[in-house]
Regions:
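Glycine-rich phosphate- or other oxyanion-binding loops that anchor nucleotides, phosphorylated ligands
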Residues: 68-139
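N-terminal short beta-loop-beta anion/metal-coordinating cradle
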Residues: 1-94
Length: 139
């Protein structure tokens, strides 16, 4: 099984930073990264194979024949910027069902070897006790 697929050539990136938005709690983190993607000229360049980390959760039936449903995509996008750093953005469509640390290690390994990243920025959300009258904040 191929764990990594490079769909197009990657040119020289300027001191690339890996940005990851993990889905989960209300999709807060992944929404932040999607906003970044949608406000720039990002290009999908590759993907990780989801089969080691996700199970098929549904099926499609066509003309009485069952087909496996789709697995979540684990895409890498490139954003070329006008600053000192270009961005490599990883956007998983779902949290891994198993082997989550293995996926994290694979992600970092591919990002280092393929994109030569220099830094990693991750977005994630966690719930906390907030009273209705409290002002929302980001920590």
């Amino acid at each position: 099984m191929t764990s990594f697929n490079l769909s197009q050539a990657i040119g020289s990136l300027k001191s690339p930073i890996l940005v990851v938005g993990w889905p989960g709690l209300g999709n807060v983190a992944s929404s932040c990264v999607r906003t970044l993607i949608n406000s720039t000229n990002s290009v999908v360049v590759s993907a990780l194979d989801p089969r080691d980390h996700f199970d098929i959760e549904d099926i499609e039936v066509k003309n009485g024949v069952c087909f496996p449903g789709k697995l979540p995509q684990l895409l890498f996008r490139i954003i070329v910027t006008n600053s000192d750093h270009d961005l490599v953005v990883f956007t998983p469509e779902s949290q891994p069902q198993s082997e989550s640390m293995e996926l994290a290690h694979k992600l970092i390994s591919v990002a280092l070897s393929t994109f030569n990243i220099e830094k990693v920025i991750t977005f994630a959300a966690i719930s906390g006790a907030v009273e209705p009258e409290d002002d929302p904040k980001v920590s």
